[in-house]
């Protein structure tokens, strides 16, 4: 066994200091999270090593209870290098313990201010990957701290607000109401009896700094435009992690995030949509976990409903068709659609409609009694009709679809008719098969889709721009869908 000399021990300490100097900011913050535990381990280890090195203290003898094992554990009392050998074993055990503490270290509420400060510095210096690697493992802690939902924060707040409160105060407003078990808050106690309990709050940390730091961190993550650009281009799945946070501001972030994704044909959203066209009979599409964004939003479509994901996709598409996003887009739409099958996976309008298709069918499969704002599609149809122009050079007006805009109208009507015919594919007894008593919009998907289809057909039939052959095709597609629901639908 090698001997650990004093010079060797000092050399090891110098190497550790040098390694710390070249660590990345992310690794340094990870070390700082466990410095207390590391210090508790390092102090006795250093004292023991120095004691064995300087004073040649013999190691403790092997306990007799171990019996025959002692001959393998004892270093040999006659050997003059025994103390140094034992010092080497202590140093080795210290190394193992230090590595374990570092790997097991987790941030705490106390470390959030430092974490936020470093993340802000990294973003300001445009070191976005380092900032994301620093923050991503701790998003849950950040979200909990910002809402004051950690156990220690809840304990402090319950003690501080224990007892009767003014019915008009904010404390009364935040107290849980309704059925279900709720923590006892002493509402019916006299104030003098509740006062000693409230005094206990002084001994429980409030962690206000952690709450403020976590809120600042979320503001940075949700509102930094440069960071959002980097997320969309390089780390799109970090955007999904942020979308999962049920905190104030997440809906606004998801809106900005999805807008950037649909506006960027090479983005992860287009890639996931292109790889998610396999239907899942009888309703909806397969949502493999590799498509992280679509799987998160639509495997449980309540996530899509909570985040109102139809709005950023629908609003961007309306602006695009109105000519407010890309001035050259209508030149493209009024061109020859000969290669549309190959082009559609990069076309924003088609992908927006396909996004709605996945969303609407997933909601129907899960029995969500909401139309998921499929009424965006008649607005798309109206804008497609207003920009429709088949008078360009090289356009065959007698073709089934003279232009790409004509093909998009056909695809749009196809999506609407497929949602109407969900009525036949829904299980018996589904509430989505119920029709409203009055002629209102209602919220069931098949009924809402029928209204949207009627609005779209009215736009098409009244158009003086759309070619007659295209109008006839869309009319026939609509009536065919009606006939599929009612055998006498064509009579």
Where are these regions (language model features)?
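Juxtamembrane/start-of-transmembrane alpha-helix segments at the extracytoplasmic/lumenal side
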Residues: 3-6, 35-39, 79-82
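Alpha-helical membrane-embedded segments
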Residues: 75-107
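Short basic (Lys/Arg) and small-residue
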Residues: 102-491
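Juxtamembrane/interface segments at transmembrane-helix termini
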Residues: 25-33, 61-63, 96-116
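Globular "head" domains of long coiled-coil molecular machines
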Residues: 4-10, 43, 62-67
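Membrane-interfacial helical/loop segments at transmembrane boundaries in membrane proteins
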Residues: 59-78
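A short aromatic-anchored loop/beta-hairpin motif
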Residues: 8, 37-59
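Membrane-anchoring/interfacial helices and their immediately flanking loops
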Residues: 1-33
